[in-house]
């Protein structure tokens, strides 16, 4: 009987008995080798089949390069595998236990803390659940490398299986992201091993790689007599292994190792002059398996975690504006805030000083056509029964929301008027391109300021190096930078609301957005509730939302939600409503009717309203006043 017919019968038998598929060329070569080993003695077909199977068990399937698993199985995120597949285990690890404790156990090291702790480790109670084993297998059919996970306990598998063991997986096997979920009914151990894998995938070596321990490397250190003395690194008694301190030290030193196969090979055989060399052990050294040094860890990027929904989808400019607003509010708490300007000799300064008790303040910074800066600071004071509060200082033209930037000199128009035996100065400062930045909108306006004529004096100082102004304002004074009250349509700014310091609960409209949620959505007493922090770009405010708003966003009231749990379809709609509510809160930027309680420094959002053309017209009218 010729080799081809014997190979054909052996192939049929392997497939029928063991579901093993092999390439015909390998099978014929294997039969020829078996016949030569038996001195060309005629073997029966059964004997030949048995010896072929034994040779297959000892063969590295990577050498056969015979594909078995379906094409593209690693690219499919989720699926099911059907049929019979004879695969090879390259390595396996119990991932339910720490790799460090496993490797110390293999080396016979005692790592318990009984000698240094006051109490011995507490033994688990009989009724406590014991941690179950979970093996992670590295499998291959010779072409595809895939992982297998012990999804349910498989008694026939254990960590002592030698690398190269062949197993048969069969039946319906689910897989996720390149990992086969193995169960007892899906696995059969066929046996075998591969000598070439015994060292590379030894259990201790696999665990050592997991904890970042380097392979055995020979390093050379020169001495003072120009002789190179080789030193074997980490070559210890395999029964004991390195101590805990040495292992930790080796992990640090691993950052400085370099993986260069050529130079490493040379160091294994010669380490200096011919008359001063010491032979080194190299039985376990294989250049192709030297672990590359771990890259030095990059400093982790700082991340800001926002509560409940990650409502941080704002631009950098908005964030900077909010930060400046917070700083401005902190400055408002001071009663007296000096303004100090450092100037060069070539700057001209005009100071308008007046002498009442309380003040309204604004600062004008103008840029002339010749690019020289001219700073004009107006300080005004009005009598108001010793009641005063501090105004924020203007540090520079970029930080202040009270700044007016223009490209032409300011024209001053002084008009004197008599009213109730008191004469006021009206200073009207106009510019063709005056602009005022507030809430990220450029508001063109004329700044009109009323000051008293009595005791007024105007002085020009060209050689001044330091100017200090004391700024005060009364509780009832008008904020000239905004020129509005709490009920000016279409909305009011939160900073104006805070500065007015209302004595009782006040209901106003603001145009704001949610900065972050400060609490979870909850139901109590049959109503929805959630807390948040809102801002309009000038200030922050903690708010609660009324039940009606949340019910409209979710689409379900609390009683309806409880009722929907009995109906799967309704409950699914409720879950969709929750997701819609989350999206709406993230994108929420509209007019909010809020009820502000000054005693709690908190507000209740009563209604939401989109901005329409009427609001736009009201805003234009307010700006043109």
UniProtKB/Swiss-Prot annotation:
Top-level taxonomic group? Eukaryota
Broad class of the protein's primary localization = nucleus
Q: Which Pfam families match?
A: RMI1_C, RMI1_N_C, RMI1_N_N
Question: Is Nucleus one of the keywords?
Answer: yes
Q: Which GO terms describe its molecular function?
A: nucleotide binding
Please provide the Gene Ontology terms (biological process) for this protein. DNA replication; double-strand break repair via homologous recombination; glucose homeostasis; multicellular organism growth; reduction of food intake in response to dietary excess; resolution of DNA recombination intermediates; resolution of meiotic recombination intermediates; response to glucose
In the record, Phosphoserine modifications are located at 225, 284, 292
Q: Where is this region: Disordered?
A: 257-282
List residues, modification N-acetylmethionine.
Answer: 1
- Record localization: Nucleus
Q: Which UniProt keywords apply?
A: Acetylation, DNA replication, Isopeptide bond, Nucleus, Phosphoprotein, Ubl conjugation
The family database entries (InterPro entries) matched by this protein are listed as: RMI1_C, RMI1_N, RMI1_N_C_sf, RMI1_N_N_sf, RMI1_OB
Q: Which SMART domains match?
A: DUF1767
Q: Record's Gene Ontology CC terms?
A: nuclear body; nucleoplasm; nucleus; RecQ family helicase-topoisomerase III complex
Q: Cross-link of type Glycyl lysine isopeptide (Lys-Gly) (interchain with G-Cter in SUMO2): positions? A: 334, 387, 426
Q: So what does this one do?
A: Essential component of the RMI complex, a complex that plays an important role in the processing of homologous recombination intermediates to limit DNA crossover formation in cells. Promotes TOP3A binding to double Holliday junctions (DHJ) and hence stimulates TOP3A-mediated dissolution. Required for BLM phosphorylation during mitosis. Within the BLM complex, required for BLM and TOP3A stability.
SUBUNIT field: Component of the RMI complex, containing at least TOP3A, RMI1 and RMI2. The RMI complex interacts with BLM. Directly interacts with RMI2 and TOP3A. May bind DHJ. Interacts (via N-terminal region) with BLM; the interaction is direct.
Similarity comment text for this entry? Belongs to the RMI1 family.
Protein's name in the database = RecQ-mediated genome instability protein 1
Q: Which organism is it from?
A: Homo sapiens
